[in-house]
Structure formats: C-alpha cells, structure tokens
C-alpha cells in the first residue's frame, strides 16, 4: 500500500493540481454521460451513474454541470464514447496503464503513442503490463468519519480487503467485483463515501532515481492533459529524499 500513497503524493504536488482541476470537470462529465447512456439516467437504478455523480460531487462539481451531463446522454446527437485501456512502458522499465473515454479511437491511440514515444517510453499491447497490477475497488473517506480503528472495523464488516489511513484520509480496498456491495455496506457505519472507484494497484513497485522520476512525471502529466484520458496508473517508487524534492 505504500506505493499507492507515494504515487498519490507525487501526483498531488504543488502547482500540478490547478492544471488537473482545469480539465477535471470535463472528464467527470464525460464519465457521467457514459454511465447514464450505459443504463438508466436515474442514479438510484444505475450503480455506475450513482458512483460517477458521487465522485463528481466530491470534486465540488456544480449540480448544473452534473444534470447537463446526464441530459446529454439522452440527446440524439450525443457522442458515443468507447472505453479503451492502453498499456505501455515508461523510463526505467516502469509499467503504465492509461484509461480513456474516446469518440475517436484512432485519434486517441495516436496521441497516447506519441506521448509515450516523446517521453522515451513505448506503448505496448493490451495485457502487456496489466498482469502486474490488481484491478480493485477503492473507497475513500475523510478523516472526520472516525479514527483508523473505527474505519478498519467497518471495512471488515463490509467485506473489504484492506485499509490505509494517512494525513489526507482513509482508503479502503476491496475486490473489484464487490465494489458496489462493499461501498453500500460501508454507508451504514461511515456514511456516504467521498469517492468510490475502480483502480489499478501495482503488485510490486520499480525503484527509479530522480532523473527517471522526473521523466515519468512529465509523461504522466502529458497523458493526464489529454482530453480523452481519464486515469493513469504506474508502478514506480522513489526514495524519501527524492519524494520530498518531487513533491515540493
């Protein structure tokens, strides 16, 4: 779990969050539209839509934006988005998984390939690196819901697999297939979660030096800046000394 926490800290470094937030609402809206189009436009009858709305609210997305994204799914002229996963290698032999929602597979594939190549990486085939990750459910709560013991007890009762607590919150991990069931069970003891989502968690992390870490961060930043890219995951780790420099 340490790798998850470290990667999160690096990606949340100063100055980067403003750049990410500028595109966050459009990415969240796209997920809401896709979720609404895949099932009923009612979050009570559509688990994926309910989670998408929940995650959007956690990022302070205005209600008008959320409603507009749902209505867009019902429009006859609305775009059809495909869910695509790309897998590749970054500097130092690190593994990277990219999740995208796109209305043009050729455009997105070309953009992602170009980003990998310019950063000294290489785009691989589907399945080339995902075997070294676990696809799991992640449910997050703010620290205000209770201490680590309370959250651990609630997580065990709900059928979760693990809990990590740091200075920013509680992170509960469960099987991907049980995400909806576990998140619903947690609500009785902890209330509504801040975020509920599926993530790719590295089984083992690859140590890299400061130079390679900086190259990797530029690669990941470029991927996240692409309008079609929803999520990026990697398996690199750095020393505490390098982490302090990168997070500054």
Curated annotation (Swiss-Prot):
Gene3D superfamilies: 1.10.10.200, 3.30.70.980. InterPro entries: Integrase-like_N (IPR017856), TACO1_YebC-like_2nd/3rd_dom (IPR048300), TACO1_YebC_N (IPR049083), Transcrip_reg_TACO1-like (IPR002876), Transcrip_reg_TACO1-like_dom3 (IPR026564), YebC-like (IPR029072). One of its GO terms (molecular function) is DNA binding. Keywords: Cytoplasm, DNA-binding, Transcription, Transcription regulation. GO terms for cellular component: cytosol. The keyword Flavoprotein does not apply. It is found in: Cytoplasm. GO terms for biological process: regulation of DNA-templated transcription. PANTHER family: TRANSCRIPTIONAL REGULATORY PROTEIN YEBC-RELATED, TRANSLATIONAL ACTIVATOR OF CYTOCHROME C OXIDASE 1. NCBIfam families: PRK00110.1 (NF001030), PRK12378.1 (NF009044), YebC/PmpR family DNA-binding transcriptional regulator (TIGR01033). Belongs to the TACO1 family. This is Probable transcriptional regulatory protein Rleg2_3214. It comes from Rhizobium leguminosarum bv. trifolii (strain WSM2304).
């Amino acid at each position: 779990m340490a790798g998850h926490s470290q990667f999160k800290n690096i990606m949340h470094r100063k100055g980067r969050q403003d750049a990410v937030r500028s595109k966050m609402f459009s990415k969240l809206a796209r997920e809401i539209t896709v979720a609404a189009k895949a099932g009923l436009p009612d979050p009570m009858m559509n688990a994926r839509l309910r989670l998408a709305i929940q995650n959007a609210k956690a990022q302070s997305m205005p209600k008008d934006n959320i409603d507009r994204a749902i209505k867009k799914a019902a429009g006859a002229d609305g775009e059809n988005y495909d869910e695509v996963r790309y897998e590749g290698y970054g500097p130092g032999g690190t593994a990277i998984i990219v999740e995208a929602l796109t209305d043009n597979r050729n455009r997105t594939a070309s953009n992602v390939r170009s980003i990998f190549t310019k950063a000294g990486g290489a785009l691989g085939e589907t399945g080339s690196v995902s075997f070294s990750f676990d696809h799991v459910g992640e449910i997050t709560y703010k620290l205000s819901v209770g201490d680590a013991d309370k959250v651990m007890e609630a997580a065990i009762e709900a059928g979760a697999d693990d809990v990590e607590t740091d200075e920013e919150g509680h992170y509960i991990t469960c099987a991907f297939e049980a995400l909806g069931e576990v998140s619903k069970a947690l609500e009785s003891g902890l209330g509504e979660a801040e975020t509920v989502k599926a993530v790719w968690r590295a089984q083992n992390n690859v140590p890299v030096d400061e130079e390679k870490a900086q190259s990797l961060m530029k690669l990941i930043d470029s991927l996240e800046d692409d309008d079609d890219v929803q999520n990026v995951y990697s398996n690199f780790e750095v020393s505490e000394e390098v982490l302090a420099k990168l997070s500054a």
